[in-house]
Amino acid sequence: MKKLLSALALAAGVHAASAQNSIKDGEWFHAVGYDYAIGLDLSTLAMPFASNGVTWAPRYTFPVGDEMSFGVVAPVGLGIAQSQFGGINLGYHYTLAATMQVGLASTQASNAFIGAFVNLGYGSYARQVRNNIGIGPAFVRDGSTGVFSEVGVRYDYMGNEVNLSAGLWRVPTSAVDKADVVSLRLLYGFW
């Protein structure tokens, strides 16, 4: 129930922000940096893979005053994933999420020293893994697709934002043999 209320509150905020602004009044922000992710099978507490990579997170927000905004963020990334059995794979992720930003870099007019944000959406964290069966393509997609949520903080570093966040791709319980993915990001922002 809390998740539903949170999603409705976020949707209401986005609607309120867009109602008072036209699409031309939005602001673009970008962040790029390091992404560490682990696959986590909650039924067995196994860790099927770990990944190191880079993420680019563009966002388009509508200001609500000088210290708050609502909008959309679409992080994409690429990394090298290593499975628990020693195999190295290509990992990649993509997400589309609603976002609520407060404080630093929530708007271009903000002069706060620190800030925070919450993202809620849908996306996928996938790996191209070697097909050892011998039939079909040499590599197959092993994806963890589901609801994405992320929380983070940011602070000012020499005039630009530095973001530290934790995210989760939560796969449905009906997705057998698919792991949830926990991601830690350190991103450098600019606009």
Listing of model-derived features with the role each one plays in the protein:
Residues 1, 22-24, 41, 104, ...:
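Serine/threonine-rich low-complexity intrinsically disordered regions
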